[in-house]
Amino acid sequence: MLIPSKLSRPVRLDHTVVRERLLAKLSGANNFRLALVTSPAGYGKTTLVSQWAAGKNELGWYSLDEGDNQQERFASYLIAAIQQATGGHCSTSEAMAQKRQYASLTSLFAQLFIELAQWHRPLYLVIDDYHLITNPVIHDAMRFFLRHQPENFTLVVLSRNLPQLGIANLRVRDQLLEIGSQQLAFNHQEAKQFFDRRLSSPIEAAESSRMCDDVAGWATALQLIALSARQNHTSAHHSARRLAGINASHLSDYLVDEVLDNVDVSTRHFLLKSAILRSMNDALIVRVTGEENGQMRLEEIERQGLFLQRMDDTGEWFSYHPLFGSFLRQRCQWELAAELPEIHRAAAESWMEQGFPSEAIHHALAAGDAQMLRDILLNHAWGLFNHSELALLEESLKALPWESLLENPRLVLLQAWLMQSQHRYSEVNTLLARAEQEIKGVMDGTLHAEFNALRAQVAINDGNPEEAERLAKLALDELPLAWFYSRIVATSVHGEVLHCKGDLSQSLSLMQQTEQMARHHDVWHYALWSLIQQSEIQFAQGFLQAAWETQERAFQLIKEQQHLEQLPMHEFLVRIRAQLLWAWARLDEAEASARSGIAVLSTFQPQQQLQCLTLLVQCSLARGDLDNARSQLNRLENLLGNGRYHCDWISNADKVRVIYWQLTGDKKSAANWLRHTPKPAFANNHFLQGQWRNIARAQILLGEFEPAEIVLEELNENARSLRLMSDLNRNLLLLNQLYWQSGRKNDAQRVLLDALQLANRTGFISHFVIEGEAMAQQLRQLIQLNTLPEMEQHRAQRILREINQHHRHKFAHFDEGFVERLLNHPDVPELIRTSPLTQREWQVLGLIYSGYSNEQIAGELAVAATTIKTHIRNLYQKLGVAHRQDAVQHAQQLLKMMGYGV
């Protein structure tokens, strides 16, 4: 629950001075991105801005306290304030904030701005006491907020110091409205108005001006002068002389002498006890101070001018002026030290009764009452955990003695889940093992099963599938059906383990069960995870259309539960969509998906972007754009050297490196990589198959055909046994290259036919295209034989078109520079030298060599088909050939002579 008073603008009191000159300046705030009001305590920042805010309906107010340094708490209140200002316009952002289901503050703010793009009227958000924020993550997020907020949005920040919000940049760009302490200081006219409203006897203007000068226009000092004069029946001038030169850091003695010592004992105790509350209402006051009518007492203190201010229009919530509240809390520690723990306990009880467990924990910690803290956690800790109050929970659990945790082992489980959420895997197992060893008596079987479910999740995250499977099975055997969360975790882990082991059908079944349970119990992140896993399994099985449809369901889930869009898991989904699009040669869409994945991870460590970057390299390679691929590989290799990655990630990164070396003939890099790359022990899943395939590709590049063939034959055996049909399709293509390069043309044709047939199921295109000219030559031969079944014939033509489109190095060889070098080559055929082709005829020869039909050549060169026939007839005559295949062979011989590996 959110405390209402933190979202209420302060009530404007009748006796306050209206700061007309400053309000005039603030009236233009809508022309600036940021209005910044800064000064030390007591200069009237909050009062001024509350005057300006009066009458503005589309304005949110957020009063900070020290607890708002928790990112999740900050986000919840900030979004709630904007919801108040917009009348609930940003419902998606509100749901994400309430459920704590966003990747970072910046991603939450990005969603907020999407919703605010449809809000066209001026909008304001006031954040009071920003100096209390010390969390650098919040500072970074607010800098992002200021950079990207809509043009009709103005942020108003009140702070005792200059906040870390990129102020200089805003100032240079004239996007900053500033009001500082010199402007906030009362002038003579305002001081006179102030005293006229506060003192029963008017004072002369000259006297008022002298007092204003004595305290340099400091509003708090003026208030103290008036209070002292009323309480002691002394002249205001005498009080002013005492305050001259005093600042906020030297007020304590003065406040004791002039305020505390001048109220009765009952009021003094009320002030000291109530000061422990960051905000207060009738029920809290009754419990903390023992007063029977808390509301009446608060209103009386307000009337006495004792620095108490209303926090909302209802008048139910109050707080002390920050300067006075800080002073009172310090005095309370000195004067009521013995009573202080009991006062905090009373506050905690009252907060609990009103449904604010996080505030209750704050007071239980301050009371040092481990038993009370334990009881609050037992009743509310899991709710706080599900709302990501992780920092508060960690602080609370650290405050409990180990014996208390052992007596309440579900708190041990909570502490372990906290560690798991922070990727402290080894600590999780150490903690649980210690607890099991030291818990007295027989441990509850259900709790033990929950321990095992968590251990299973840790094991799979840490790359230990065997242990994960054992623990997940134990958990599922012992967990009651009602313990749905742990059952979802254990089922998901078991399914993931079976995926790793290559048992795809059973893994798919378990992931479907996980999805059903997760949807039923609204555990949406596990529902999304299970859909992603299902899609990966279907891809591995070769059912790419089914994988596509599962991905569509996952995208629909994200659309329905929009908070999921902010999770890193969203990147996983768009990444596997990019992989599928790449396989189908939809390269522009694949690249866009990969880049959207990088955008999802923009606030995370760069290492997290490795997989999407790998896909960008793949797209460049499939297009034959080796320069761009090299540039992207430089970044990829830098990331590889600065992180620890799952073997799947390494396999994918190595794949594009080895393909690049193949396309550029870089045998040195391939040999070096092969020497230092460990060979996996198995090949029973897609990422282990992938790394073995990388090894075989490097061996083929180095001419090590025999060991490469052994590897590929074993991979095929495993792939057929485990029904890893997509891997089988890839393996056949690489085996085709091995046979082709080793001169075994019949074997090459046989496995290519198998690969084409299997591609009817997988839909693979780019996997053929990436093999370049060797694949193009074979496909041209198969097409000319005219023996392929209709579907394979159609696919072969499509693949050849893609190769011709993206791998233009064949055509580029017949440009003017190439022709000039060719004609000057000592081995050029005499017929070419004595009867040279025109530049257009060279272009036509290049396109014939690339497999273009006459119609395609005409379209490529934008001329009539009859013109192309004339060019072909002329070049045939000059080359001394009669048939198209003879021209292709002649072009191939010329390319070989010039040193091109065709």
Curated annotation (Swiss-Prot):
Organism per entry: Salmonella dublin (strain CT_02021853)
Record HAMAP family: HTH_type_MalT
Taxonomy, superkingdom: Bacteria
PANTHER family: DNA-BINDING TRANSCRIPTIONAL ACTIVATOR DEVR_DOSR (PTHR44688:SF16)
NCBIfam families the UniProt entry points to: PRK04841.1
Protein name: HTH-type transcriptional regulator MalT
UniProt subunit comment: Monomer in solution. Oligomerizes to an active state in the presence of the positive effectors ATP and maltotriose.
Keyword ATP-binding appears in the UniProt entry: yes
